[in-house]
């Protein structure tokens, strides 16, 4: 599943080509995504100028003069720019054609993504209960410490909870916990304030660096500009179970936490 850096990479790739452009028409070839695409999306969006392309957690917000298209890439979705009128292939479900002659094309083989319309996106039911963005001043180690008190849940699924902080998915939680030296199995309530301060710093650092590197390409993700990400070449823990730790050489172990695979170093993380 594309994580926050991949979604931000997509946003940065498509925004310069969308912002200020007027939509000429919307072509929906298959509306059967996680939730059905609104039947009147073409009527609502066509003729409007796109004001801004923003992101909230893993949702892309394509803001028009009146209303906002909320898009989620799901498990296998991607958005890329093509020439308007380019014949569509299988799984290319939606084209948003622009007066510039380009079209924003949404592809999603598994159809777990979303394209929804809202006049008040930040109060939409999918967004209203989300926690703070990790790369803002609203998120820090103090928040992690305070929210974790009394919790017996393992620290990794705790930091992956979107009510605590958004966008820290499996890949980046694994990497941040490795960098902070925290065993992902440790109870969230047992982690000290000092270690949460370190973890928050590492979450911010790793996410920012992954965005700079274009995200992490695993399986299906392709950025909005057609370029894959390269951060996967620098992973220390994620997907490396059974391999030697890049820091100490100890064999990395893999366990299941919250139904997700989690890799850690038994020597570097405690």
Swiss-Prot record:
The active site is at 2 (schiff-base intermediate with dna), 3 (proton donor), 58 (proton donor), 260 (proton donor). InterPro entries: DNA_glyclase/AP_lyase_DNA-bd, DNA_glyclase_Znf_dom_DNA_BS, Formamido-pyr_DNA_Glyclase, FPG_cat, MutM-like_N-ter, Ribosomal_uS13-like_H2TH, Znf_DNA_glyclase/AP_lyase, Znf_FPG/IleRS. Disulfide bonds: none annotated. Keywords: DNA damage, DNA repair, DNA-binding, Glycosidase, Hydrolase, Lyase, Metal-binding, Multifunctional enzyme, Zinc, Zinc-finger. Binds 1 zinc ion per subunit. One of its GO terms (molecular function) is class I DNA-(apurinic or apyrimidinic site) endonuclease activity. A zinc finger (FPG-type) spans 236-270. Its cofactor is Zn(2+). Its EC number is 3.2.2.23, 4.2.99.18. It catalyses: Hydrolysis of DNA containing ring-opened 7-methylguanine residues, releasing 2,6-diamino-4-hydroxy-5-(N-methyl)formamidopyrimidine; 2'-deoxyribonucleotide-(2'-deoxyribose 5'-phosphate)-2'-deoxyribonucleotide-DNA = a 3'-end 2'-deoxyribonucleotide-(2,3-dehydro-2,3-deoxyribose 5'-phosphate)-DNA + a 5'-end 5'-phospho-2'-deoxyribonucleoside-DNA + H(+). DNA binds at residues 91, 110, 151. The keyword Metal-binding applies. One of its GO terms (biological process) is base-excision repair. HAMAP family: Fapy_DNA_glycosyl. Involved in base excision repair of DNA damaged by oxidation or by mutagenic agents. Acts as a DNA glycosylase that recognizes and removes damaged bases. Has a preference for oxidized purines, such as 7,8-dihydro-8-oxoguanine (8-oxoG). Has AP (apurinic/apyrimidinic) lyase activity and introduces nicks in the DNA strand. Cleaves the DNA backbone by beta-delta elimination to generate a single-strand break at the site of the removed base with both 3'- and 5'-phosphates. Monomer. Belongs to the FPG family. This is Formamidopyrimidine-DNA glycosylase. It comes from Pseudomonas syringae pv. syringae (strain B728a). The lineage of its organism: Bacteria, Pseudomonadati, Pseudomonadota, Gammaproteobacteria, Pseudomonadales.
């Amino acid at each position: 599943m594309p994580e926050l850096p991949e979604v931000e990479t997509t946003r940065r790739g498509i925004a310069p080509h969308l912002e200020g452009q007027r939509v000429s028409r919307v072509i929906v070839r298959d509306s059967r995504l996680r939730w059905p695409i609104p039947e009147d999306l073409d009527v609502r969006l066509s003729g409007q100028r796109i004001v801004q392309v923003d992101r909230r957690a893993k949702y892309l917000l394509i803001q028009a003069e009146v209303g906002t298209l909320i898009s989620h890439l799901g498990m296998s979705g991607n958005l890329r720019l093509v020439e308007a009128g380019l014949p569509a292939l299988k799984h290319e479900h939606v084209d948003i054609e622009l007066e510039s002659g380009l079209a924003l094309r949404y592809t999603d083989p598994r159809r777990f993504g979303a394209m929804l319309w809202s006049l008040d996106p930040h109060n939409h039911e999918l967004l209203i209960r989300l926690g703070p963005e990790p790369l803002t001043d609203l998120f820090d180690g103090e928040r992690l410490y305070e929210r974790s008190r009394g919790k017996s849940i393992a620290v990794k699924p705790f930091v992956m909870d979107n009510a605590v902080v958004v966008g820290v998915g499996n890949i980046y939680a694994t990497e941040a916990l490795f960098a902070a030296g925290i065993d992902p199995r440790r109870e969230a309530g047992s982690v000290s304030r000092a270690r949460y301060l370190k973890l928050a710093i590492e979450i911010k650092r790793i996410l920012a660096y992954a965005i700079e590197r274009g995200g992490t390409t695993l399986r299906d993700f392709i950025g909005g500009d057609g370029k894959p990400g390269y951060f996967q070449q620098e992973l220390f823990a994620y997907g490396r179970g059974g391999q030697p730790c890049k820091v100490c050489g100890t064999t990395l172990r893999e366990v299941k936490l919250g139904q997700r695979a989690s890799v850690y170093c038994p020597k570097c993380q405690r």
